[in-house]
């Protein structure tokens, strides 16, 4: 057997963040934080923004359900955010067309719940009416009347011109309070029928000022998440997370209105004097989509068993380590094998991620996906002392060659991880995670043998 040649990990050219910590646990007792996750539809999800930030930034555990990796989903239109960036806004900005689309989604959701057309129309009219605009940053708290209106004459030969306006009517309108019965009916944004992650208990939305004045550094200045300050008890954090899910989300809708620059009537160029004036109107989002941090079963069990910084709940009942081992093994028959490999490589300092994209069990990153490309694609197999047993993935020479080619073309190396269990290990021992103490690991790196290269090396010798 030839000796393996190890290649250093390839660092990414553009890195936009700093490395914080390998694990979400600190050296001191004051830095420790117990996070919470929920078992939903055989998946483990984290709902609290603070827990999501803790688990992803320190160890890169999980991924956002609406994002490629980091949970940074926002409904804001990027072009509108850059256009209105001088207004110091901290709530999402969307177009009128996108808002009407969400109104239609909310209408369909309410009709599916049994409401008639008249009731649905009345509910949505009350729920989506314009509100007062209290969501400015601290730097612009005294400038509630400022706006960045774009004035566009309704003619083809006129250029766009931007001008500043101090008219408070451009953004602010009436400020009615959220009526209890309307909010309870118009719960398309937090209703279990439209969001399976939200619980079944109804709760009155929180006050506008209490939820809107909190800004989260993780989500940026253009996204309202309502994250609470650090240092609060876990129970209070859970209650605030639930109330935040049921509280309304406020958005700024860019709308157009026509106005006349020349008040004289009977003018020959009256049509040219009408302009389209863009303004931001604050409204409730009738159909809210939540993003959560989804953990793989291996990541969730590692956080519970190895680090002890996560508690997984099923409903309101916390699950024990033995119960999680049993449930995860039923949900995923190969869980024991893949977790053994995950635990081994995590302990070695690698950041394992799901390798489904390349047809393997795991991908190994140094530090994390934002800093380095994946170095290895791992296939894990559980065998006995004689390297015998029922393999999860019997590989023929053709399939092994194809898998290796796929891995090499992505600038990675194929690694076979054999988890060797003693011959005297019983099924009772395998039923608990204590079996990890008796497992041995052997790694094999697969390389393609090239005959011409071998001949040239022999000739050189």
Swiss-Prot record:
The keyword Amino-acid biosynthesis does not apply. SUPFAM superfamilies: tRNA-intron endonuclease catalytic domain-like. It is found in: Nucleus. Residues 201-210 have a biased composition (Basic and acidic residues). Residues 144-176 have a biased composition (Polar residues). One of its GO terms (biological process) is mRNA processing. GO terms for molecular function: lyase activity; nucleic acid binding; tRNA-intron endonuclease activity. Gene3D superfamilies: 3.40.1350.10. It comes from the Eukaryota. The active site is at 365, 373, 412. Its main location: nucleus. InterPro entries: tRNA_endonuc-like_dom_sf, tRNA_intron_Endo_cat-like_sf, tRNA_intron_Endonuc_cat-like, tRNA_intron_Endonuc_N, tRNA_splic, tRNA_splic_SEN2. It is an enzyme of class 4 (lyase). One of its GO terms (cellular component) is cytoplasm. Keywords: Lyase, mRNA processing, Nucleus, tRNA processing. Its EC number is 4.6.1.16. Residues 140-176, 190-210 are annotated as: Disordered. It catalyses: pretRNA = a 3'-half-tRNA molecule with a 5'-OH end + a 5'-half-tRNA molecule with a 2',3'-cyclic phosphate end + an intron with a 2',3'-cyclic phosphate and a 5'-hydroxyl terminus. Belongs to the tRNA-intron endonuclease family. tRNA splicing endonuclease is a heterotetramer composed of SEN2, SEN15, SEN34/LENG5 and SEN54. Constitutes one of the two catalytic subunit of the tRNA-splicing endonuclease complex, a complex responsible for identification and cleavage of the splice sites in pre-tRNA. It cleaves pre-tRNA at the 5'- and 3'-splice sites to release the intron. The products are an intron and two tRNA half-molecules bearing 2',3'-cyclic phosphate and 5'-OH termini. There are no conserved sequences at the splice sites, but the intron is invariably located at the same site in the gene, placing the splice sites an invariant distance from the constant structural features of the tRNA body. This is tRNA-splicing endonuclease subunit Sen2. It comes from Gallus gallus (Chicken). The lineage of its organism: Eukaryota, Metazoa, Chordata, Craniata, Vertebrata. The gene is TSEN2.
């Amino acid at each position: 057997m030839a000796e393996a040649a190890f290649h250093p990990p390839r660092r990414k050219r553009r890195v936009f963040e700093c490395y914080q910590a390998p694990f979400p646990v600190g050296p001191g007792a004051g830095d420790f934080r117990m996070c919470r996750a929920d078992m939903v539809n055989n998946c483990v999800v984290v709902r609290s923004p603070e827990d999501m930030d803790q688990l992803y930034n320190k160890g890169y555990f999980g991924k956002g359900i609406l994002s490629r990796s980091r949970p940074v989903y926002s409904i804001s239109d990027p072009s509108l955010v850059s256009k209105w960036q001088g207004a110091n806004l901290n709530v999402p900005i969307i177009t009128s067309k996108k808002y009407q689309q969400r109104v239609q989604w909310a209408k369909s959701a309410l009709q599916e719940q049994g409401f008639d057309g008249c009731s649905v129309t009345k509910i949505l009219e009350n729920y989506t009416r314009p509100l007062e605009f209290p969501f400015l940053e601290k730097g612009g708290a005294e400038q509630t009347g400022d706006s960045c209106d774009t004035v566009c004459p309704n003619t083809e030969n006129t250029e766009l011109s931007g001008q500043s306006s101090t008219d408070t009517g451009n953004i602010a309108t009436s400020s009615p309070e959220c009526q209890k019965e309307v909010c309870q009916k118009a719960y398309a944004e937090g209703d279990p029928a439209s969001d399976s992650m939200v619980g079944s208990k109804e709760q009155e939305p929180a006050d506008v000022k209490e939820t809107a004045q909190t800004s989260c550094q993780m989500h940026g200045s253009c996204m309202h998440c309502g994250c609470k300050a650090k240092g609060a008890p876990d129970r209070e954090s859970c209650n605030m997370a639930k109330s935040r899910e049921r509280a309304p989300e406020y958005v700024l809708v860019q709308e157009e209105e026509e106005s006349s620059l020349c008040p004289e009537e009977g003018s020959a160029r009256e049509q040219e004097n009408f302009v389209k004036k863009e303004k931001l109107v604050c409204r409730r989002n009738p159909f809210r989509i939540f993003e959560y941090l989804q953990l793989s079963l291996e990541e969730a069990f590692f956080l519970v068993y190895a680090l002890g910084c996560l508690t997984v709940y099923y409903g309101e009942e916390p699950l024990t380590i033995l119960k999680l081992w049993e449930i995860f093994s039923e949900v995923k028959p190969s869980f024991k094998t893949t977790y053994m490999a995950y635990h081994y490589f995590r302990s070695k300092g690698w950041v394992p991620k799901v390798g489904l994209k390349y047809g393997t069990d795991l991908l190994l990153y140094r530090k994390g996906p934002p800093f380095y490309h994946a170095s290895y694609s791992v296939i894990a197999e559980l065998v006995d002392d004689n390297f015998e047993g029922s393999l999860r993935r019997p590989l023929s020479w053709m399939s092994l060659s194809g898998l290796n080619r796929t891995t090499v073309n992505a600038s990675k190396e194929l690694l076979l991880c054999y988890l060797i269990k003693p011959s005297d290990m019983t099924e009772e021992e395998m039923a608990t995670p204590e079996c990890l103490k008796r497992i041995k690991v052997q790694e094999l790196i697969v390389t393609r043998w090239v005959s011409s290269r071998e001949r040239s090396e022999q000739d050189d010798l």
